């Protein structure tokens, strides 16, 4: 689990939050349409939550994870949108803010019917739906 990896490297949740580092960013080898490496982030609280089961996958069905599924390492966040599952993981980083990738900042947002002017939408300041709608599923 990612929480075990963070603890192994001496990262303490309470100490990280005191310094304002409340997000765990993941970056992959491929690039998005904006030229920025594909990435995502989750709240650090989720990374440390034992029930969230955030993990780094290197196998799938008992075999090394196939290239098309993220070989050699994939960041997996159960219960959230697929765009948070970063393939070809190159980096995990504690941060003061969410990832700057397009899928984190511009996609998976929900705005009510009261928003009538798309130019007035505060994209970067609005959390993604993963923080509003908790999806439950199980990994065995």
State each model region's role.
Residues 1-7:
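Long, well-ordered hydrophobic secondary-structure segments characteristic of membrane-embedded
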Residues 7-140:
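Extended, aromatic/histidine-rich regions of cofactor-dependent oxidoreductases associated
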